[in-house]
Amino acid sequence: MEIAQALILGIVQGLTEWLPISSSGHLVLLQIILLSRSSAAFIALVHAGTLLAVIVAFRRDVFNVIKSFLEGISELPKGSAFSSPERKLPLYILIGTVPVAVLGLALAKYVDEIFGSSKIVGVGLLITAALLYSTKWAGGERPLDLRRALIVGLAQSIAIFPGISRSGATISTALLSGLKREEAIRYSFLLSIPALTGFLILELIVSPAHEILNPEGLVGLLSSFITGLIAIKFLLSIIRRGRLHLFSYYCVIVGIAILSLL
């Protein structure tokens, strides 16, 4: 892989991981167009860049979640460990992560078939479009609870399939479940951290060290980190203005084009 290709793939990963248009789908398409399949190590590094982006963007929330979890653990003997909403959030994140972990392990041996199909990408983008468009009618003031945490976690699990946007699926589902807009945003982004961390660890385990420590990988990591931060800031402004559905038009156009041409 050349530096220019690494830069392009890193930028695409950074933008599409957080914009609700499916990073996996766009990476699959780019690899088809460039006739170059990225190594597991490179994929891991660009995901590391987007993971760092969300941790930096939500650093206060990440700190508070860790703090609440540790405080809850320390008060287990008292019987009031996870009674407050702040203390419950770490548990909701763990519970919401279970579906994607289970489905990911179940589909592990089918990775090549799933990620080698442009038709799956096209269908996935149309599903993403439907979810995003439906948010035109979403709205609520309900707090996060166990049921909604699990529902959003299930939505995250289907984003394993290329073409289905993780951020699009989780934020749309959270809004449709009646969650307050800010709570839907916060939970969706915090929920992504364990999933991305798990994926990153699995990819690094099977990656030779020499494939990780190279200029192309560093370019991919830095470009995905920088563009990831930009994408998160842009997406937050769109959601807060109630215009998440606008991304559905792009997903429909690209999804139909893929199914028609590839």
Curated annotation (Swiss-Prot):
Highest taxon, organism lineage: Archaea
Leading EC class: hydrolase
Catalytic activity field: di-trans,octa-cis-undecaprenyl diphosphate + H2O = di-trans,octa-cis-undecaprenyl phosphate + phosphate + H(+)
Chain segments annotated as coiled-coil in the UniProt record: none
Keywords: Cell membrane, Hydrolase, Membrane, Transmembrane, Transmembrane helix
EC number: 3.6.1.27
Membrane topology: Multi-pass membrane protein
Pfam families: BacA
Transmembrane segments: 15-35, 38-58, 91-111, 114-134, 149-169, 189-209, 219-239, 242-262
Any one GO cellular component localisation term in the record: plasma membrane
GO biological process, one term: peptidoglycan metabolic process
Subcellular location: Cell membrane
Main location: membrane
InterPro entries, sorted: UppP (IPR003824)
One GO MF term attached to the UniProt entry: undecaprenyl-diphosphatase activity
Function: Catalyzes the dephosphorylation of undecaprenyl diphosphate (UPP).
Family: Belongs to the UppP family.
HAMAP family xref list: Undec_diphosphatase (MF_01006)
Protein name: Undecaprenyl-diphosphatase
Organism: Korarchaeum cryptofilum (strain OPF8)
GN (gene name): uppP
